[in-house]
Design a protein with these regions (language model features):
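N-terminal secretory/targeting leader peptides
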Residues: 1-54, 62-168
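Short beta-strand-centered segments that line the small-molecule binding cleft or hinge
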Residues: 57
Length: 168
């Protein structure tokens, strides 16, 4: 059976369930496992992957082999690769330089992104992508870094006045 939109279990619980065999398959961003495996957060860092072609090449590159080995050591089999360009949706002006983040509350998407936003003077909030819309709508966050798919799927354009798009 297929359970869409975290209806079987919460997003952040899926990695542990995959490891334990309680969940058979998940279309799961590797950065969601970054709390346990910090090395996986490299996939969400800005300017590390600059094109879809480069992202796909990681599968057979040394970095891809290492990521696959790390996941397999945790009991998770990586079946396919997908890289998505992303950006920052904001309720106010676009965030294009570090000073633009100062004083804002931002969903960074990974520990490392949170560290960068905090260094720029922002407060951060940790949540899966499917919680961004309501958090922006209620004012719990001012902006969110996320994938292009999430920007579109969760209709963040309805709440955003600014968008900072990444390359790719």
């Amino acid at each position: 059976e297929i359970y869409p939109n975290s209806s079987l279990m919460k997003t952040f619980a899926q990695f542990d369930a995959l490891k334990k065999g309680a969940l058979d398959l998940s279309l799961y961003p590797t950065t969601y496992a970054g709390g346990e495996i910090p090395e996986l957060n490299i996939t969400f860092m800005p300017a590390v992957v600059t094109s879809y072609e480069q992202g796909y090449r990681w599968k057979k590159a040394p970095i891809g082999r290492e990521m696959t080995a790390i996941l397999e050591a945790k009991g998770v089999k990586l079946l396919t690769w997908m890289w998505q360009s992303g950006g920052i949706a904001s309720r106010g002006a676009p965030i294009v330089k570090p000073d633009d983040a100062k004083g804002l509350k931002i969903r960074g998407g990974s520990r490392e992104m949170d560290m960068m936003f905090k260094a720029a003077g922002a407060a951060t909030s940790n949540m899966p992508s499917n919680e961004i819309y309501i958090s922006m709508q209620t004012g719990a966050i001012d902006a969110a870094a996320t994938s292009s798919t999430s920007l579109i799927s969760f209709k963040l354009e309805e709440l955003s006045k600014g968008l900072t798009a990444a390359g790719g």
